[in-house]
Amino acid sequence: MSQLRIFSYLPNPRIWKATIVARLAGVDLDVRGAAPKELQSWLWDFDARPLSAAEGTEASEVRGHAGFQGKLHKTAAFLEAHPFGTVPAAFSPDGKVGIFESNSIMRAVARLAGDKLGLYGKDPYEASRIDSFLDASLVFARDSQIYLLALGSGSLSEEIYGPTRDAFATYMNGIDGALSKGRKFIVGDRLTLADVCFVAEFALFNNEKPRARDLKTRGLEPILSEKLDQLFPHAIAHFARLSKHPAFAPDVVPYMEKIERATAK
């Protein structure tokens, strides 16, 4: 039996926060899901699966939230476990306890392992500093999600672009500064949840690359500029290095290769 079940649209770099930590710490996960469009015909439940006609009449119909259009089929049990009704949605093995938001799901995986590797810091001070970086990522994550959805739907405006550009610069400056002076990790002297979170969020934002031409036709410069290595050298090198790590590579490498192929078209 898995120690944690996760339901989400796939692929989803924010799920990597859990899968990477699970590989590092030896936690057994059960990940279920499908492409965003397919989830409209899924039953949103602990036992998430493609929806049958009979189940469709029993499940609650809720209008789609960010990233989804139309109605979604959510059971009462799903909504009780996940009051905000969003994915990724994690569950305890019995399905009674719901855990939501990717950073919290990642923390849960570390806790399930007893965190023998110090992924959540070696003491309360480091743990709190890690939390600080995770909280900072939430500001960038919110803006990046709105930005990428607008870019994909052709509804991008300067009101969305400007704040996202600024949020990206703020986030990357903070990460780059934390990695300056020869530091190998964002917090302390070992790999932590802060590093895992950074890799996931930066990889997700790379979905801007295939839309670079669309941006330029609107008179906007890609936020992921060609000078990224010069602007944030430590952060970019850190991402490249961790992408090759055995716990990261199974998620990161195929995803980034797919983005590069789409960008080259």
Predicted feature locations:
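C-terminal helix/juxtamembrane-tail motif
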Residues: 248-265
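GST-like domain detector, emphasizing the conserved glutathione-binding G-site
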Residues: 1-165
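Primarily interfacial, aromatic-capped hydrophobic alpha-helices that serve as membrane anchors
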Residues: 240, 244-250
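GST-like fold's C-terminal all-alpha helical module
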Residues: 121-240
